[in-house]
């Protein structure tokens, strides 16, 4: 924008108001709050446009909507055009949007000119409040509703003038008759005229009375319509915002769901990899019978997948039929007890792996149908596959591994379930059957079945969902060690061949027993000293944190009023700078005037000073003369005294 326009605005309005400061930055792109402050300051100082705005509109906090801002500026533009009579091309909508700063400056310049010329704005304010609007060419327009009664009044006035003209013509025609007839006729005509005029005046008064409420109603109707439109626009905007927020939430939920699915898949993949690693490790240590067991386990897993799928579908149907208020704890206990009984009986009675797996699955499926609670049992049994996989020696543990792996496969997605051996895979190594190993394994079933049951009980009672990721190298929990103590140690130690997991559990049990031994008295004292020192440090740290919290709170409390003060500092500094410049200019002017006066007085005093010096010289001369005369007088007196003295002496002689 041109700097000359800003300069003109500063010159026009700077003589009227001092606040807000008329800086180039604000005038180059004036915001609505700045214009509102200028107009309210003009009204407060000069009284121009007084009564145009209500008390609520005079406060900028109440004028925040776009429609309110536009109406505020439109009133000011109409009044300025009516008072000045000059056209204004400024549009309030463009001004509110921050466009057309030059036209905005023209409006401010016209306001300043009207205030400097002291033009009255009372009539213009009344007309604007009545609904009239100023044309961009400087003419006055009225609203369509306000024009209708005015058009009626114009027509009525025209009809009155026509009637009066007709009457005057009749009077002129009758004037040709005698004078006395004229007087009588004039008297007779004047009476009905006066009556008609009185009637017309009364009618006009009634019409005006009727017009005023109609105008008020029209204004109220327009205001209500504008408010209703604004409300509708706000409602639409709010609905659009709500829709957008809902869409964003749906997108976030979808993205979160996708992320959770990906995380679950990653976890499942990691579990599968860990299991494969453990199996590969155990496979290296075991012999050919273990390979045969793994093959048989694969076959049994296929069967178990089919049976568990049927059991799961039946349990889902049963869970929908049953009510949610049933006692879940008792049912879970019944489920765990029945499953344990069925597993132990299957381990002790049936030697073949292929026959035990489907029977256990059938028992478990029937139990699920009776109790209709599938999820807790699945979670409880989901902890034991890692334990069963760690043990590669007894056949009973392999049976457990079959059933538990089948149940875990239901929890995993279909893509991550154990896939049967494909047809394109290389042929399996030849099986070498040894009767001695099978006999020893069959003999070991009675001893190892009990240990497996204890492990299953522990997995059922554990509530930690992360136990599915059990690693062989990690130490077991205290609850597991306590239950292992319940098992007779003689049965475990007598067996020569134990699984890797049982050995690890025994080692951790021994370590735990060593840790359980009573500590030394010196260690107790050290621990007490460390605890007391730790408590002191904790108290000191908590006190420091409390002090820091209090200081932060006080800082925040003082920062808010300080920030409010800082908003007004710029305005105050600008005003003080302007005032300082004004006083500096006045000081310069007075100094120049003083120097001029001093030069004038000096020029006027110089001849007087010369005269004064001359008079002083004359005074000195006269004083010298007086002194000389006095000296002569004294000399003469001495002479006289001598002469008198000599005369006295001579007379005495």
From Swiss-Prot:
Disordered as annotated region, ranges:
134-467
Residue numbers carrying Phosphoserine: 437
**What keyword terms does UniProt attach to this protein?**
Cell projection, Cilium, Cilium biogenesis/degradation, Coiled coil, Cytoplasm, Cytoskeleton, Phosphoprotein
> What ranges does the record give for the region DISC1-interaction domain, renumbered to this chain?
229-653
Similarity comment: family membership: Belongs to the TRAF3IP1 family.
Q: Which organism is it from?
A: Rattus norvegicus
Q: Record's Pfam families?
A: MIP-T3, MIP-T3_C
Any one Gene Ontology BP term: embryonic digit morphogenesis
Name of protein: TRAF3-interacting protein 1
Q: What does this protein do?
A: Plays an inhibitory role on IL13 signaling by binding to IL13RA1. Involved in suppression of IL13-induced STAT6 phosphorylation, transcriptional activity and DNA-binding. Recruits TRAF3 and DISC1 to the microtubules. Involved in kidney development and epithelial morphogenesis. Involved in the regulation of microtubule cytoskeleton organization. Is a negative regulator of microtubule stability, acting through the control of MAP4 levels. Involved in ciliogenesis.
Which segments carry the region annotation Abolishes microtubules binding when missing? 1-306
Q: Subunit arrangement?
A: Component of the IFT complex B, at least composed of IFT20, IFT22, IFT25, IFT27, IFT46, IFT52, TRAF3IP1/IFT54, IFT57, IFT74, IFT80, IFT81, and IFT88. Interacts with IFT88. Interacts with IL13RA1. Binds to microtubules, TRAF3 and DISC1. Interacts with MAP4.
Task: Write out the coiled-coil annotation as residue ranges.
Answer: 533-628
Q: Which GO terms describe its molecular function?
A: microtubule binding
Q: Where is the composition biased (Polar residues)?
A: 448-462
Bias (Basic and acidic residues) occurs at 145-305, 325-335, 370-384
**Annotated GO CC locations:** axoneme; centrosome; ciliary basal body; ciliary base; ciliary tip; ciliary transition zone; cilium; intraciliary transport particle B
